[in-house]
A protein has these predicted regions:
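Short N-terminal or domain-adjacent regulatory/targeting segments
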Residues: 1-16
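Conserved beta-strand elements of the Class I
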Residues: 21-23
């Protein structure tokens, strides 16, 4: 540990890896700090000897963005980030927010609404037989018997 997690194919290859064990797909910008759950999960896996790559705010309109590292040996780990993507995008009165506090420069539009669903669909489209593990606040809110306030 000590180096940042690979966030590009070139960084993964520089470590001498052919394939990651896990690819963590996150709706937030990459922040390697223990106040971010993604960093804790990735660093814990890394400390156990797993090869973890971090795919931050991939372009959800382009399946090739989800093929950045190739198919992970074990699974895609998918989270919308520190906050539900709908809460991140809209106020309680359903007005669009002006800034994304978990994106560099506060730029809006780097993650889709319902990011966990969209990222999962794109990972599945990229690799039909890949294992997908969901986590985070959004994944826990978007379950089978879920009333979606936004609709």
């Amino acid at each position: 540990m000590g180096e940042f997690l690979p966030t590009t194919y070139e960084e993964m290859k520089a470590r001498g890896w052919q394939q990651p064990d896990f690819v963590y797909i996150c709706g937030d910008a990459y922040v390697d700090h223990p106040s971010f759950g993604a960093a804790i999960i990735c660093r814990t896996l890394e400390s156990r000897g797993f090869k973890v790559c971090f795919l931050s705010q991939p372009d959800w309109r382009d399946v090739e963005a989800f093929r950045e590292f190739g198919k992970p040996r074990l699974a895609f780990l998918i989270s919308s980030g520190n906050i539900d993507s709908m809460v991140n995008h809209y106020t309680v009165s359903k007005r669009r927010r002006k800034k994304d506090l978990y994106t560099a420069g506060g730029q809006m539009g780097k993650r889709p609404d319902r990011a966990v669903i969209v990222y999962s669909q794109m990972a599945r489209q990229a690799y039909k037989d890949a294992t997908i593990i969901l986590g985070g606040i959004e994944a826990s809110l978007r379950r089978l018997a879920h009333y979606d306030y936004w609709d």
